[in-house]
Structure formats: structure tokens, C-alpha cells
Amino acid sequence: MSFNGKSRSFLLRELIRRDFIKKYKRTTFGILWSALSPLFLLLIMDLVFGTFFGRNMSHYTIYLFSGLLLYNYFASSTKGALSVLYSNASIYTKVPVPKIYFILSHSTAQFINFLVSLAVYFVFVAVDGISFKLNFFALIYPTLCLYLINLGISIFLSTVYIFFRDINYLWPLLCRVIMYASAIFYDVSILPNIMRRLLKCNPLYMCIDYFRQVVIHNSVPTLSYNLMLCAMTVFCLLVGGCTYRICRDKIPLYV
């Protein structure tokens, strides 16, 4: 059985639809959870950290929401991808379906959830007194970069999981480290210069900071900033793609 262009496109759409529906199957609120989950977390963290970090910072709620929203998308997308290849083995070991489609569909379904949450984010931006500006269209760039970063990391993790199951426990711990290294609830100005430079080695922080610069400070990051984020995105895709390419023929033997 072979797949032409139309068949592959149809298959990918159906897989995305399956992954998107599966997440909210048999829930009362359905897709609304994409909006409710970050709101509940925002409320709790704003109450806890707003007192300590938000007193001398304007639009702290949006500052916090920017970090939470992008981190939650990153964490849910990459954690959920860990077992994607393993859990779909019963399909691609019997039907010649491109294995990478399962990771791509998972990442895209998570991206759709993120876009729903992003709509809620802009409602909060308006409520906080920040008016819409043309600069906001610049957010398309970090949004797409984060999607591709998540995709690259997801391909890497899902492939490694087949051969090294301990990654299922290690990655959530690393995500916790990444959370603290992404300046979600604290102002980076309290950090020494060397720590600020180290933060810029974290692509997630770069995306979060991009959102904050555009929305809160009404400025678009420099060309060098954009190129650095682009380089990190390409690096993540290359690592994921190369790992998958090296291991893909061995995957059916280990599932």
C-alpha cells in the first residue's frame, strides 16, 4: 500500500483531528479547558507571586500570563509526545504509514489548543489596558518558532523513548528546570548579567521574552535577536530530525 500526496494529506488531517478530539473526549467543557486551565493557573500564581514580584512592575498579570501560556504549551506538547511512537505502534507496524506523521499530528493538535488559549490571552491584554497595535502581528514569528521548536524536541523525545524508557521520568524533571530558567514569574532585571546571558540560550525564554517585548513594551526585537531565535529553532529541528532518521528503521523492532 502506497500513499500519494492527497492520501498523505488526508491521513495527516485525520490524525490531527483524532488527537485533537481525543484530548477532550467525554469531558463536560471540552475545548473550553484550553482556556480554563491557564486561567486557573494564572489566578493562583498571580496571587502567590504578584505580591513579591509584581509590586514594581507594570502589567505584571500579562507578564506572568505570557510566560505561563508559552511554558504550558511547551510542556504539554513535549511531555505528551514522549509515548506517541510507542502507543501508535499497532498502526504503523501493520500499515505503511509514515511514523513521523503521528508526532506531527500530536504537535499540531497541541498547537491548535495553544491558539485557543492565545485568544484568551489577548482578551486579558485588552482588559489590562493595552491597546492593539500593528506590532502585535510580529508575534506570528515567535509563535511559529515555538511550534517548530516543540516539533523538533517532540521528534527527539518520542524516538528516544522507544529505546530509553527512563526519559519518561527524566523529561518532566527537566521541564521543571526549564520553567525556572524561563523567567516566568520573576523579572530578569534582578539577575546578574551572566545569568541574563545564559537565559538567552533557552529558546523557550526567547519566545516568552519576544511576547513581552511586543505586547508590554511595544517594541519588536532586533534583527540579531530574530536570527538567534531562528538558529535555535533550526537546531531543535535538526536534532529531532537527525535522531529520527538514524533510528527510524530500528523502531519497529523495539515496540
Language model features with spans:
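Hydrophobic transmembrane alpha-helices and immediately adjacent juxtamembrane helices
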Residues: 1-255
